Amino acid sequence: MRTRRAATAGKLTVVLATLALVVAGCGGPSPRAWAASVCQALSPWRAEISKLTSSTQQQMTAQTTPAQAKENLVRLFAGAEEASETARRKVEEAGVPEVERGTEVSAGFQGSLGKMRDAYGRARTTIDGLDTAQAGPFYDGVRAAVDTLNKEYDASALDTSKLDSPELKQAFDEVPECR
């Protein structure tokens, strides 16, 4: 009898703990908390992308061999790809903001960062596949890869017109992490 009660109590504890997790998972972070988390995720990403842009421009004009330029560009684009995935993952970890259409807002941010990650990955793969035997064709290939990257990057921008949230707009304007 005692064993049966202990087993029942143990099952009840597990059910209650699971229910508590489910209920706790229903409410997402406040708009301010979510905006702060997103800005903390995007700040290092922006810095990395800025560094990439500057470094790519330098590589395109530097007096290096095609093999050196290829190695440097592949490394730079791999870094941007990794930074984009890290930012995407951190936005995912921020959860869903407690606002109307919060799921769509979070998914939009994650989707945009995922598309950027993929664009950098494709640019890295394209440049890694270029032949470095002749400088002219190599740099033409690099320019084409960067042009494609820029188009894909522009196309991956988050369309905020459908995800407009006054609470999130205010939060992004107010939290110190976003300044």
Predicted ranges, named:
Residues 22-25:
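C-terminal motif of bacterial Sec signal peptides marking the signal peptidase cleavage site
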Residues 45, 52, 56, 80-83, ...:
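Amphipathic alpha-helical coiled-coil/heptad-repeat segments
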Residues 36, 67-78, 103-110, 114, ...:
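Short, charged, amphipathic alpha-helical segments
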Residues 27-78, 174-178:
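Immediate post-signal-peptide N-terminus of mature secreted/exported proteins
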Residues 2-16:
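Bacterial N-terminal signal peptides that target proteins for export
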Residues 85-110, 122-134, 159:
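Short, solvent-exposed, charged loop/turn and helix-capping segments
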Residues 123-179:
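A charged, solvent-exposed segment within the mature domains of Sec-exported extracytoplasmic proteins
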